[in-house]
Amino acid sequence: VAKGSVRGGLLLGLAVVVALAATGVWNPFPGLWDWVDRSEPISEPDVVWQVRVGGTPRSVTIAGDTVVVEQRTRVEARSLATGTQLWERKADWSAVAGGDRDPVVAVGKLLVKGYELLDPATGVTRRRDDDAVAVWTYRNLLLDAHCTDATDCTLSAWDPRGTAPLWTAFLPGVSSGLLADNPGLRGTRRLTATRIDDRVAGPESVPPLLGFPVDGRVHVVDTATGRVLQNVEPGRDERLSVVGGRMLRIAARSQDGTCYFAISARDPATGQEAWQRAGVNLRTADSAGCAQREDPQGARNVLIGVGPDGREAVIDGYDGRLLWVGEPGTKLIAVDDRYALFRAADKRSVVARELGTDRVLWTRPVSGKAGAALTPYAAVIGDEKPSRLVAVDPRSGRELAVLRTPANALAVGPQGMIVGEGREIGYVRFGATGGGPAPPPGNGGTPGPGGNGPNSEDDDNCGPKRELCPDPAGGKDG
């Protein structure tokens, strides 16, 4: 009898609560759900803000004072200062172009021609295109392609916020794929790291030359003028790549049970050989044989190769110089035009070197599984046991942020970075746990590959030796 009374009382109480909730007199469920759904802090120390977005992010980009979050069927922008949602749009793909002061967001639909350029702060359409089949986004340029048929395409270059093309060029086709944003070109393949997104650095400055693959050939386009410099067909054992203002012909020949590699770098304007190296493996072939199915590893104007002795090296794509050669047992984990980060042979530390010099910039203790990425504003290191994300000044090693977190590094900007786990994302401001932020690119003091003088952001587009820009004094190029 007692058990029946208790059960009856509970049922009566539940019925009363449901009746009160249904009539709007009192509803405990929203508060209860808020308590159940409350997010745990994504890191320690805590982030400036933390929000749960509608779906798992496909990419996250800091665009000026906003954060652009691409999801599977939508894109949204949030305030960098507060995390508040500014706008949301249905879209199957999105990509950010422009720099810190002039960003735009390109959005489009799956298998549908055209795109819109949105203002990241308001979501307002700045420019609309109804016919483009592909879009490439850079820090200082946006490219799109229109095709009247499969073999008749026009490549157009735009200032990110421009209203008229800067130049146009003819291409006999474009490889676009299902999603139109940034189809693959013949350049370099970046090093990757677990817990650090491949696009953490955001859009880069457009290289001086781009290689467009069309029907087995590579068309080399000068991005300053739109001139098509070469239309090259690779040999049977070759792979073509455009790096550092050069056309690379990478040969892999099978003999005696191994692969023999040779690199010939040519000036696309003249076709003459600029440099060559034999015996360097750029990791273009898989382990099953010598068939080259991948772009060479590298970043912007530099290449990553492995010598016959098994040591890794960083090579200047323009003149073929060895900018860094690792010691036996060291492992390169991140590289750009300025620096190389490698894991020491003892697997207990990460070492930063300035390319083209013997100077060690800094050393930091890590575990044997640590990964890293270099961005214009910070070097990001992801470590395990304990699980940490660390951002440091790439030149000095000064700590900008140190987080105890299982989250991933999704995007890095001038003043901080976005971290995320699942649908949760949060903003970490640099300086909260360390020094101030690194200077943005273009403020001087940033050498090109193996260089020792300051480069502006415009200089980044001139090639490592300014080979594609005129001498401001009116002299010879160089």
Name every feature range the model reports, one short phrase each.
Residues 1-478:
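Secretory-pathway ectodomains
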